UniProtKB/Swiss-Prot annotation:
It comes from Thermus thermophilus (strain ATCC 27634 / DSM 579 / HB8). HAMAP family: IspD. Keywords: Isoprene biosynthesis, Nucleotidyltransferase, Transferase. It is an enzyme of class 2 (transferase). It catalyses: 2-C-methyl-D-erythritol 4-phosphate + CTP + H(+) = 4-CDP-2-C-methyl-D-erythritol + diphosphate. Its EC number is 2.7.7.60. It holds the Pfam family IspD. This is 2-C-methyl-D-erythritol 4-phosphate cytidylyltransferase. The record marks 138, 194 as: Positions MEP for the nucleophilic attack. The keyword Thylakoid does not apply. Catalyzes the formation of 4-diphosphocytidyl-2-C-methyl-D-erythritol from CTP and 2-C-methyl-D-erythritol 4-phosphate (MEP).
Amino acid sequence: MEVSVLIPAAGNGLRLGRGPKAFLQVGGRTLLEWTLAAFRDAAEVLVALPPGAEPPKGLGAVFLEGGATRQASVARLLEAASLPLVLVHDVARPFVSRGLVARVLEAAQRSGAAVPVLPVPDTLMAPEGEAYGRVVPREAFRLVQTPQGFFTALLREAHAYARRKGLEASDDAQLVQALGYPVALVEGEATAFKITHPQDLVLAEALARVWSA
């Protein structure tokens, strides 16, 4: 794949309470190893690690020191990217199929910006204090995943704009959208869930036993 894969993996995993997620073991492999396996066909893979972390050897990636936030880490990776198309992926989403990568890549090549999404399966409710509040139509919402694909020049412009305006976002699509550039949606996958809480590890361990991308 003629694409630069950017993996911000410099987070400290505070919510999970197990140290940096990149080195968390699931099914006998680290999340970083699972993630890199999903992008083994990419021409370039760049990973941002926590400051002071020892870069793993033999994984076929270039390792850089990450920033204080996810956004800062992606910005550093972007500076090092050498190809005209990038995929940005969270290391906490280790189970990424080749089909999902292909869909995002194809849409990004066509439109310049693309993200995978899933419909919301549960009822969405805005609570009123501690009481049941207004139900929000779930059909109007989507869960946003990674990998997210962009023209490299476009994402660099979006990050530069965010720095000028003092914008901070939880993903890169928000920064591109802030430029007024449309972001295409493609079908996501439930297996590409984000490991955030301890209960997510139970699902991840079960999936690791049967996973084949």
